[in-house]
C-alpha cells in the first residue's frame, strides 16, 4: 500500500467522484483497527 498525502487523496477523490470517510478516535489501538 502506497503512502500519500491527505491532499493527494482528497484531490483524487474529487476528480473521480467518490467520498473519503472520516473517523474520530481517541486511542491508538482504535486508530490502528480503523486503518486495517
Curated annotation (Swiss-Prot):
Superkingdom, natural source: Bacteria
Keywords noted in UniProt: Calvin cycle, Photosynthesis
Q: What are the GO BP annotations of this UniProt entry? A: reductive pentose-phosphate cycle
Q: What is this protein called?
A: Fructose-1,6-/sedoheptulose-1,7-bisphosphate aldolase
According to its UniProt entry, this protein's organism is Nitrobacter vulgaris
Gene name per UniProt: cbbA
Amino acid at each position: 500500500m502506497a503512502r500519500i498525502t491527505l491532499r493527494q487523496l482528497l484531490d483524487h477523490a474529487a476528480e473521480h467522484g467518490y467520498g473519503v470517510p472520516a473517523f474520530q478516535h481517541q486511542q491508538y489501538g482504535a486508530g490502528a483497527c480503523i486503518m486495517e
